[in-house]
Regions:
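Active-site helix of classical SDR
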Residues: 121, 157
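Conserved glycine-rich Rossmann-like NAD(P)H-binding loop of the short-chain dehydrogenase/reductase
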Residues: 30-45
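Conserved glycine-rich cofactor-binding loop
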Residues: 7, 14-15
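Residue(s) in the substrate-gating loop at a strand-loop-helix junction
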Residues: 141
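The beta1-alpha1 cofactor-binding region of Rossmann-like NAD(H)/NADP(H)-dependent oxidoreductases
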Residues: 39, 60-71, 103
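Substrate-binding pocket helix/loop in short-chain dehydrogenase/reductase
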Residues: 97-98, 105-107
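C-terminal helical subdomain
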Residues: 181, 201-238
Length: 263
């Protein structure tokens, strides 16, 4: 698809992956709507987007307020002249051993990472179906397919989102609306590693990839129609290996985790 003259709504757009994706979409010719809580940072991203797409707009909104999402979606459609591309990027981490996890923390992660994007998607979907076109992008994680240690709540939320997207891809066949999931690994340039209530990552942070690689993956799935794209791509081989022998995969992750945590 061409993005020239189309509109795109990006959540979690005030920094990190969301900001870079929004700017990439604007540079490709789309009018971009930005959604995040931090108005000051959104204004900075909006200014950069407007260098390419002057009609871009922003909404300072808290997506954990599920009851406000329908009004946000309606306002975005009015302002942007319909939403052709939705990138559900807003989310939160939760890096904690399951024996240290509280029920409230698990629910909070599922609330923002799964229920919120589902609400926004369902609010915008009727307009896409009516127009006979649209692209729904979920920002997943390799954790959705691999279930890494110390990330049970986060992995479950991204797995739920991925499963919803898989079913939706079949349900929307023939409507003109396409469905995509981008599954990033460790990405630099975010603030997620420093948020309170999270353990230090077990993985080596020097392996983190720039968010521009995620933005490139979003543009690629929009252009190709591909359902799922890993960043980096070789994680698809790891996911396939896990599917072939889950017991062996879990045994290997246990050994890797023991080695990483050894004094």
């Amino acid at each position: 698809m061409t993005l020239e003259g189309r509109s795109a709504l990006v959540t979690g757009a005030s920094s990190g992956i969301g900001a870079v994706v929004a700017e990439a979409l604007a540079a490709a010719g789309a009018r971009v709507g930005l959604v995040a809580r931090r108005k000051d940072r959104l204004e900075q991203v909006l200014a950069r987007c407007r260098e390419h797409a002057p009609d871009s707009a922003m909404w300072a909104a808290d997506l954990t307020d599920l009851d406000a999402i329908a009004d946000l979606a309606a306002d975005a459609e009015r302002t942007l002249g319909g939403v052709d591309v939705l990138v559900n990027n807003a989310g939160m981490p939760k890096r904690r051993r399951v024996q240290d996890l509280t029920p409230a923390e698990a629910e909070e992660v599922m609330h923002l990472n799964h229920l919120s994007p589902v609400r926004l998607t369902l609010a915008l979907l009727p307009g896409m179906i009516r127009r006979g076109r649209g692209n729904l992008v979920a920002m997943g994680s390799v954790a959705a397919r691999l279930g890494p240690p110390h990330e049970a709540a986060y992995a479950a939320s991204k797995a739920a989102l991925t499963a919803f997207w898989e079913s939706m891809a079949v349900d929307l066949d023939g409507t003109g609306v396409r469905v995509h999931v981008v599954q990033p690994a460790l990405i630099a340039g975010t603030e997620l590693f420093t948020l309170p209530g999270n353990e230090e990552p077990i993985s080596d942070l020097s392996d983190a990839l720039p968010p521009q690689e995620v933005a490139a993956a979003v543009l690629e799935v929009l252009a190709s129609g591909r359902f799922e794209q890993y960043v980096p791509g070789w994680f698809s081989e790891m996911a396939s290996g896990k599917a072939a022998d889950v017991d062996a995969f879990i045994a290997g992750v246990k050994e890797w985790t023991r080695d990483r945590l050894a004094p």
